[in-house]
A protein has these predicted regions:
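Short hydrophobic alpha-helices and adjacent helix-cap/hinge residues
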Residues: 1-138
């Protein structure tokens, strides 16, 4: 695909800043994998990306509301509800081994305001598959 990855092993907030600050000036995008530490610092990552005019993807829809271009992943609220329901079943006496294996529902979210800011057009087929395709905060 002609991609060059610039991986960063990030476990602390200081490592996050050490990884973001020296990013090459010619990067085309920032991809954030599923990671609680990165998710809790999405605003900082997106702020750097916005200054550089670089699109960012996150694994959760909440990251799009914080300024990422798009996400394909889980909804934190829905995952919390799912976890609470399963915890309630276990606390009510259902053995954990009797619970079915469940995965979180994945969806795509697109931030059209960020696309406009970055002067990017979002393909119609991508918008058709997006669960939410709106402006910041929608």
């Amino acid at each position: 695909l002609g991609l060059t990855l610039v991986p960063a092993d990030i476990r602390t907030l200081s490592q996050l800043h050490q990884a973001i600050d020296p990013l090459p000036g010619d990067i085309d995008a920032i991809f954030m994998p599923h990671d609680a530490m990165l998710a809790s610092n999405t605003r900082a990552i997106v702020a750097v990306a916005a200054v550089r005019g670089v699109p960012t993807s996150t694994p959760h829809r909440e990251g799009v509301a914080q300024g990422a271009l798009f996400s394909y992943g889980f909804n934190l609220y829905a995952v919390g509800r799912q976890a609470a329901r399963l915890a309630d079943q276990i606390l009510s006496g259902t053995p954990a081994t009797d619970l079915p294996i469940e995965t979180a529902e994945l969806d795509m979210t697109v931030n059209l305001a960020v696309a406009d800011y970055l002067n990017l057009s979002v393909p119609e087929d991508m918008l058709r598959h997006a669960r939410i395709a709106g402006r910041v905060g929608e």
